[in-house]
């Protein structure tokens, strides 16, 4: 049911490059065709300040709403309630992002969360790091990674081919949209907090990018960054 709703939202929001009026230099370069690959932006460390840049360069991006909650805060005039949405976006092929948005209505909260998730997009390292497998095909993660957010801590471990994603529903959604098919996970803390759980999983995936590898190790692990060929 959730996947069908996501597909309908994606159809409604098919990106029109011609109608887009970029506000930043990078956005203008993308619209002109000077930049045609999102890897160029990420490798150069350029800031993603417009979600439309991601829409233009990754048209196959999918989104999934993980959670919508009613939250409250105290004000001198009384309690003020807003909706908080948690969303994960990815193309199931090496790119993923997690975002949160708040608003007085559900729709705007989800749209804000989607925009935030697109701006936080990262490349994911995918490989075959399990000693039980060694197939060399990028289907899992290349090595163990840890991430944290709030009280939640997540540890990702490489798994052999065919195991699947042994994880909670939130972590499974993040890993699945990142393009990882097999992985084991360990979780600690209050994983009922959806955003913290999603962000901790996202942090673990991001930490994979900070591990240095020799060319021979990359070849042995079948390591790829971004799109899996």
From Swiss-Prot:
* UniProtKB keywords: Ribonucleoprotein, Ribosomal protein, RNA-binding, rRNA-binding
Report if keyword Ribonucleoprotein is assigned: yes
Keyword match Ribonucleoprotein = yes
Q: Which InterPro entries match?
A: Ribosomal_Su5_D2-typ_SF (IPR020568), Ribosomal_uS5 (IPR000851), Ribosomal_uS5_arc (IPR047866), Ribosomal_uS5_C (IPR005324), Ribosomal_uS5_euk/arc (IPR005711), Ribosomal_uS5_N (IPR013810), Ribosomal_uS5_N_CS (IPR018192), Ribsml_uS5_D2-typ_fold_subgr (IPR014721)
Gene Ontology CC annotations of this record: cytosolic small ribosomal subunit
Q: What biological-process terms (Gene Ontology) are attached?
A: translation
Q: Which residues form the S5 DRBM domain?
A: 61-124
Q: Which GO terms describe its molecular function?
A: rRNA binding; structural constituent of ribosome
Biological function = With S4 and S12 plays an important role in translational accuracy.
Tell me which PANTHER family the record gives: 40S RIBOSOMAL PROTEIN S2, RIBOSOMAL S SUBUNIT
Domains: what does the record tell us?
A: The N-terminal domain interacts with the head of the 30S subunit; the C-terminal domain interacts with the body and contacts protein S4. The interaction surface between S4 and S5 is involved in control of translational fidelity.
Family that this chain belongs to? Belongs to the universal ribosomal protein uS5 family.
Quaternary structure, from the entry? Part of the 30S ribosomal subunit. Contacts protein S4.
Q: What is this protein called?
A: Small ribosomal subunit protein uS5
What does the record give as the organism's lineage? Archaea, Methanobacteriati, Methanobacteriota, Methanomada group, Methanococci
